Amino acid sequence: DDADLDAYFKYLENPKSLKSISPSGKFYQELGLDKELVNSFVNIEPGADQGGSSIGKAELFLSLFFNDVGNSEGGIDPETGEIKKAKGDNNWEGVGNLEVKGTNGRLGQQGGRGLDATDTFENLAKDLLSDEQLKEFGDRFFKKPWTMSTSIAELYKLAMQNKVPETKIQSKINKALDVVYFNQNLANDYFKTETDFTDLEEITKNLLKLNAASYSKAKGIDAILFVDTAGGENRYVIVNKSDYDKTIDNKKFWTTTKGPTGFQWTNVNPNLVVAKD
């Protein structure tokens, strides 16, 4: 209504920068504006840009409310006619390409549409287990989409029992994970010690760190903003790529499944949500 528009235009007289607000919180509180006004802008979905990239919720809001954020548009090369995809969703001044993820956003393709990594997992097990172990392991883990954390921990234990050198076990698992996560060769940065491969909570944290870092490296992304576009409170968390590990350790964003079960070999890029206060 007119009052909301007046409040918005008044805000534009002295807009905030994205860098100036808390790295996590609620947008309407940080901006000092009515919650419904902010929600109405967060929920705008303009469609696709010239390059065919979908402009999702909160992307336009960021460029309209923060003076250091602009739209990151795809386009057509005037010389070649080639369609160029935008890197990230917004340009964040002084930071780089900002990716925006709404409720249930993924750092990769949706399950069933992207990579099904079950073949990679089965080949990994064949490399590390005896025939007898493989049959029992396959009966448990190949016939339904078992979680990555549980299956990695069990595979590690059985491979050790099979007298496979620990360095080889770790190397084989990490190579398989690098295939799954955009071939960026970052798994060794996260999976280093026995605990990294056997503790279900640590495995899940490491998978999320690897997913975020590899996705960002592959896509040229410098920061990610997660925003709850479904709860009506516009809760958010902003994460520079240098802070992914710390933010994930603190579970500021996490899989929709609270336990260490969100990653599956048939769904290696699970839905993610902003943590509640």
Predicted regions mapped to residue ranges:
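Active-site beta-strand termini and strand-to-loop segments that position acidic
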Residues: 90-96, 100
